[in-house]
């Protein structure tokens, strides 16, 4: 198990569904960040319905491996939080990376007593005009709502107080940010955003399906989005399954068919 010292202070939770291509890269980014703090850091990879080498690679690279078979990313993250030994929880998706001073800044903000928790700005690992537009839209949304996501950070006691990640199939990150911010107000603390570090966001879906991907999806699925806004999320849930929960399954099937 990867621990920078005997006493674990920080637990980094990485949910993973068939992520053998990305899990080592993500773990290594956490290790680099862990080298810059003077406390114990554990890495927990939550293997979700994995049929590839994700668990094997995660364990070989020092992560604690736990499993969860649900089809809800929030539930997967909550499984990792339940297994965590650290006082501080940080979550990051497996295809993404954190910058090297992320954990140091997280600890500084939480130890200041001013912050209940928060998120981070997002920067993509490559850029084009449509990806830049996508980033601008995300940044504007974060700025006007104050609900920063990407990398979540808070004390484990805070996640326990709000019931963990909101167990919704979609927009669970926004719902969780709202819950943590609301709880923070009661405690006299702010929901914040890292200023000097950020999430390095994977562009794998853009690489495979084109850089205008999310604009095309929004246009083609406008009806599903409107129905979801009015309370009927059935069509939207199918879209979420296709683009997220089943994405790696399709990718793996395609890779295996090419190899055969």
Name the predicted role of every residue range.
Residues 47-55, 96:
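A conserved acidic beta->alpha catalytic loop
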Residues 39-49, 66:
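Short beta-strand/loop segment that forms part of the nucleotide-sugar
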Residues 89:
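Short aromatic/hydrophobic "clamp" motif used to bind/position activated sugar donors
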Residues 9-11, 42, 175:
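Cell-envelope/extracellular polymer assembly enzymes that use nucleotide-activated donors
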Residues 100-130:
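Conserved donor NDP-sugar-binding/catalytic core segment of glycosyltransferases
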Residues 68-84:
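Glycine-rich, basic loop-to-helix element that forms the pyrophosphate-binding segment
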Residues 158-161, 169-188:
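A short, conserved alpha-helix in the catalytic core of glycosyltransferases
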Residues 19-34:
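Short, well-formed alpha-helical segments that are part of the catalytic scaffolds
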